[in-house]
Amino acid sequence: MDILVPNKPKYRSLCMCFHCHSAQASLDGGSSVKALVKRSKELGRRSATLTDHGQMGGLAELYEESMKAGLTPIHGVEIYLMSPWEPPKIYKNGKEEPATCHMTVLFKTQKAYEYFSSLTPIAHERALIKYGDMKPLLTWEELQEIGNEIVLGSGCYGSAVSKALKAGNPELAEQIYQQIRSIVSPESFFVEVMPHILDQKWIRPEYDKVSKEIIKSGMFVPNDLDECGSPIDLQKASNQFMVQMARKYKDPIVISEDAHVAVEDHKVVQDVRLGDNWRFSCSYSLEPTEVWADSLMKQMPDITSRDIEEWVDNSYKIFEQFRGYKFLTSKNRHLLPTMESVYNVSSDTSSVQHLKKLIVETGRFPKDPEKAVIYSERLKEEIRVLTQLGYDFLPYVFTVHDVCIAMRERGYLANPRGSGCSSLVLYLIGVSIIDPIEWKLPFSRFLNEGRVKGGSFPDIDLDISIREVCLDYLKAKYQDNMALISTDVAMRLKLTIREVERWMFGKVRSSTEDVLDDMPFVPQGVSDLHFLFGYEDESTGEHVQGFLESGSQAAEKLKNYIETEKEIWEVVLACSGIPKTRGVHAGGVVITPVPIQSIIPLTKVNDQLATAYTMKWVEYVGGVKFDFLGVKTLESLSHSFKAIQENLGVVFD
């Protein structure tokens, strides 16, 4: 009996992807961090890497997903460097714009992570906006400063070396190469060879009308043609030069995928996200070594199988440099403001002592002996839960108290909503106007021992009549220790259908608009798939009817669209839920005992700095969210109270 033996791969798997982008940062990423980690695992790799363009917002998620998958997370960033080797571009109006180049940086230590995170505010202040994407800029000197803590790659087609080569100056290209490799130790510099056939880097929207129509139909126009009209592989010359330099200076070479999608099928998501900004002409996905070996050996006929094996082996050498990397999360720390930063008190004063002082000053503790016993027992239990279960949550309470009192002193209404009103502590120090004992509200609605042991923090939503005043107060008080929290603005169902049609046809067809006009919007907090097909309610276990099950005329229209436009619908499902842009959390801010950018990278959203991590990942790395919500109804009430006081002499507490 013949035994079938599966074909053994010619090459072992790459240990890691040296250069990888996600949909979490710039528009040219087409896959989620989770999908990239999953693909790395499928390919038999030992690690997952993320080096988004100028952004670090996906690094916490990469760490979590990698740990769950049993992979080593490798953090990094592809920086936009203000090139010291090129003159600035000068426009007709006299405005100067610095020349930029790309460089791949991997963090060997937590110190490197914190260093690049700390530079995110200034990098975003210098940022260029190009074709809808932001390019935060760093300087050569800032890169040199951290050389001992990083692994450095020679970069992609947008690197300084490749740009000098493209400009026809190989001498300058070699000088730049020498300078770059000198920043780090020899074992921490790797020459990147890109296994892509790059017949064009991208298509820009300013091309003529004919080119635009070709782009919209999914085809591509080569930027460069040889004499016979065949596309020139722009990457080929760069790779050949890099290999030449590596051999001359005895530097290790690594196959650098520059992945922008996990699998080739995700490229359509990348295209839809980019819209008319530009379109990659080939798929930058994570692939088996054999695929890249074939590509590189076709590009460079002098490359042998032994070269490929050596380059694969180098990926394992890189991996070894990250075994000791430690990334701090909420398992290691909780970054609450200190009591001393909230109030002008001595560090010798305990949080419980200061709480009792506030209670006395507020004067809400009952003087009746019988009531005092009841209140004392409840207060004792609340203090136990807040301070004696492994955490001291009173600095969180004090921060909210300080904001609440400051807003009221300035003439603005402020009061907690929801479960926070179940806390006697909040009532006794003057934050809440609701006496939870009088209204029979149990403290367990707000916080209990089980929740604390499960890792939950107290969550006080403070409603304020004018949020901007509150934010100004927080910025003045905490300065770099406070930041807004960003949100992902995902591609939801209606938007996704429109974006996909614009990508495929250059416009949204009128028949499709007719379908969309009758569709309700997906409710907040409900996924597109749950909205369409229904879901099981977690609290009741009952099936919640989906829109397509409703039998309405609008639902039947959408059903017909799905049946007749199957190709479009597949793309819609692939894109749905992928971030399209960034927003700012309606109420959330994070306040820490140290400058935020040293632990949480920042980004620019609508011309204001906010955390590059969304709320889930801010809390994952130990940040604590405070909710200060602007409520227009309170502003209206405030005006009403003032009018009543002025006209009737009635004063409200």
Map each language-model feature to its residues.
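Alpha-helical scaffold/interaction cores of sigma-54-like transcription cofactors
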Residues: 2-653
